[in-house]
């Protein structure tokens, strides 16, 4: 199935907003990677086509919760239950935030909740829908590691570079740090130790990452990262957004 993978901009969407996109025939390989406004994105084909929206790692925060026994994942009370579990940990009003549970979450078992600005996400998806590109799924650019090794990702530009750590700490969370000497010192042995994990760096910041970390990096483009994100089991379009993407895509055909 051919897939158009779009990365949502951190700023609010407008007519001139450009989206980095990757076009893939199989979800693994890219046939095109570029940037375009919503009106100029590649036209999709027949029912085999899918649009996937990627939420940037810097737009998300993550919290670990344990759902109470007996709560159904289809319950209309689930959103209110999450608000109750999270309200003392959040800096913003829960009503202004969008929540999404990790795939396979079960009552009585710890699960990750992805959190982002509710109005920003809704406006971003509406802008794509208005341009004829309704996302069938919404996925995180990077997410907590359920298993596997810790990973370091160097992202951005030399002027605004970040280091993202997935599989961070005993809960295997996601941490986002400035890619700077001071921040790396605070990160401690995970980044600067004797056996640190491999670094996956975007080409624009590869030299900076090698200089600061003192070791070679593996190149990984934002297109490759988007392809990997689209293959994940995540779908952030939950609760009030649950029908907006998938249902629109199905209705279209």
Describe every region a protein language model picked out.
Residues 1-253:
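Hydrophobic/aromatic-enriched cytosolic interaction surfaces used to assemble or bind macromolecules
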């Amino acid at each position: 199935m051919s897939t158009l993978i779009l990365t949502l901009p951190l700023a609010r969407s407008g007519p001139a907003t450009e989206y980095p996109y990757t076009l893939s025939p199989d979800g693994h390989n890219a046939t095109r990677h570029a940037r375009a406004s919503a009106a100029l994105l590649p036209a999709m084909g027949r029912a085999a086509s899918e649009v996937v929206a990627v939420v940037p790692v810097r737009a998300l925060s993550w919290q670990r919760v344990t759902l109470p026994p007996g709560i159904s994942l289809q319950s209309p009370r689930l959103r209110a239950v999450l608000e109750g579990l999270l309200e003392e940990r959040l800096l913003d009003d829960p009503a202004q935030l969008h929540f999404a549970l990790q795939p396979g979450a079960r009552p009585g078992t710890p699960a990750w909740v992805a959190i982002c600005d509710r109005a920003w996400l809704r406006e971003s998806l509406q802008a794509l829908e208005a341009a004829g590109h309704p996302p069938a799924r919404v996925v995180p650019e990077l997410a907590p590691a359920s298993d596997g090794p810790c990973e370091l990702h160097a992202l951005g530009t030399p002027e605004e570079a970040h280091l993202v750590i997935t599989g961070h700490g005993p809960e295997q969370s996601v941490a986002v740090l400035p890619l700077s000497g001071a921040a790396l010192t605070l990160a401690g042995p995970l980044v600067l130790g004797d056996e640190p994990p491999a670094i996956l760096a975007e080409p624009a910041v590869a030299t900076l990452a090698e200089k600061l970390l003192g070791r070679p990096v593996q190149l990984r483009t934002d297109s490759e990262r988007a392809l990997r994100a689209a293959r994940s089991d995540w779908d952030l379009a939950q609760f009030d957004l649950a029908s907006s993407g998938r249902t629109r895509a199905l209705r279209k055909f």
